[in-house]
């Protein structure tokens, strides 16, 4: 499991040769990504190089005294293609330098001339960790395939498919992003590719993790302030658009009868997917103006739909950075968790906000209108006649709704819907013993029962009425009883609450 598994999920099981050529002779470079370090405007450099053998991805790092510290060469086609796709992606296009200026050209020439010495340093005892991870022999310049399957981002041991670390404490040359990847791989709440967990199946080719883990991963990468971390972050969050999930405690069946009925109920954590968060790379700030009048980001809104967005509007129209400017501005702040339940349903004047009203009404649709087992008014289902004018629901559905109402405290305007529920629901029981040859049904039969959770709802409604907290709630001009769904009835009530000038009627009347 690795944070870049989705980006190269189609790689299959392949080995990657680390080490590279003893001599470096390229005739064209592209997609240059630079990052400054204290004392050196060119501390990190990543780019694509074209030589007689083909295309390769090269990483290099210098210290504050402009001494070359590490370098790596990767010519795996899938990896170079992924880096090229990131370079061409609309959210990162303006962050790459496509035509190097004089300063960058001098750095490229220096790197080319010092390549053999850099590779020798990588093979020295100081680079033993990387050597062990690559599974290389002691022969200098001899590249052998790693013992473990998959590939890793050059200079790391954990950022890739699987890992190539000898033990859990090992880190690669780029220790900062490698540490972030290692901690993200250890997220305790995750769903592996094509696996089922927390009530959902992951049909993707990459692991999805809890939103808390993704948030910590994003913060960790941004705190590194280097180009390698930003490549990992932009690819994982922006290009792949990998979602995350939050866990919600819900009541569900934990033991079943052989005939399909529920034998025991319990509270279990169920996953709810959240749209991916956008990674604000430190290099992207070069495309923005540092003036004080820059736009401030809008506060995050509660997520209501599980859809993926292509990127925030402020990324559109970003200008290509100056070739001479290699210093990144201050990193943007990481957005907080987005798995916050909608709050503040009441408006400033006590009215219901439209967004909160829709959120409340959707709970009635999810738990009642879409209830799998229900008996319509004056209909017979599961060998039971519902003589009432309102639908009769399975106790599982009403129990989940009651728990939702108890936890989220919806506005009093929806209390009328509780009255329509009544205090009874039904459970499914196995069929009665049927004598062979008799014409009797072998289907489950419904048994109407008095539900304690519904009685508590009614008690709460009466308490609110006695306190007078709902006397100002409007009553729609048309009666709610009829074939209208609970969702539509809820919308009708909340719309009336937002228009106090309409005809109103107190519950106490």
Swiss-Prot record:
Instruction: Quote the record's domain comment.
Output: The phospholipase A2-like domain represents the fully processed form after N- and C-termini are cleaved off. It is the secreted mature form found in biological fluids.
Which residues are noted as glycosylation sites?
Answer: 167, 280, 325, 396, 439
- Give the organism the record lists: Homo sapiens (Human)
Q: In which tissues is it expressed?
A: Expressed in kidney, heart, liver, and skeletal muscle. Also present in placenta and peripheral blood leukocytes. Not detected in colon, thymus, spleen and small intestine. In lung, expressed in bronchial epithelial cells and alveolar macrophages, but scarcely detected in alveolar epithelium, arterial walls and interstitial fibroblasts (at protein level). In joints of osteoarthritis and rheumatoid arthritis, expressed in endothelial cells (at protein level). In normal heart, detected in some vessels.
Query: Biased-composition ranges for Low complexity?
Result: 284-296
What is catalyzed by this enzyme?
a 1,2-diacyl-sn-glycero-3-phosphocholine + H2O = a 1-acyl-sn-glycero-3-phosphocholine + a fatty acid + H(+); 1-hexadecanoyl-2-(9Z,12Z-octadecadienoyl)-sn-glycero-3-phosphocholine + H2O = (9Z,12Z)-octadecadienoate + 1-hexadecanoyl-sn-glycero-3-phosphocholine + H(+); 1-hexadecanoyl-2-(5Z,8Z,11Z,14Z-eicosatetraenoyl)-sn-glycero-3-phosphocholine + H2O = 1-hexadecanoyl-sn-glycero-3-phosphocholine + (5Z,8Z,11Z,14Z)-eicosatetraenoate + H(+); 1-hexadecanoyl-2-(9Z,12Z-octadecadienoyl)-sn-glycero-3-phosphoethanolamine + H2O = 1-hexadecanoyl-sn-glycero-3-phosphoethanolamine + (9Z,12Z)-octadecadienoate + H(+)
Q: What is the official name of this protein in its record?
A: Group 3 secretory phospholipase A2
| Localization, UniProt | Secreted; Cell membrane; Cytoplasm, Cytoskeleton, Microtubule organizing center, Centrosome, Centriole; Recycling endosome
Q: How is the cofactor bound?
A: Binds 1 Ca(2+) ion.
Q: Where is this region: Disordered?
A: 123-149, 283-354, 458-482
Its EC number(s): 3.1.1.4
The protein's role, per its UniProt record: Secretory calcium-dependent phospholipase A2 that primarily targets extracellular phospholipids. Hydrolyzes the ester bond of the fatty acyl group attached at sn-2 position of phospholipids without apparent head group selectivity. Contributes to phospholipid remodeling of low-density lipoprotein (LDL) and high-density lipoprotein (HDL) particles. Hydrolyzes LDL phospholipids releasing unsaturated fatty acids that regulate macrophage differentiation toward foam cells. May act in an autocrine and paracrine manner.
- Cysteine pairings via disulfide bonds: 159-181, 180-220, 187-213, 211-244
Q: Which residues bind Ca(2+)?
A: 158, 160, 162, 185
* Biological-process GO terms, alphabetical: acrosome assembly; arachidonate secretion; cell maturation; cilium assembly; high-density lipoprotein particle remodeling; lipoxygenase pathway; low-density lipoprotein particle remodeling; macrophage activation
**Catalytic center at which residues?**
184, 214
In what way is its activity controlled?
Arachidonic acid release is markedly increased by glypican, a glycosylphosphatidylinositol-anchored heparan sulfate proteoglycan.
- Coding gene? PLA2G3
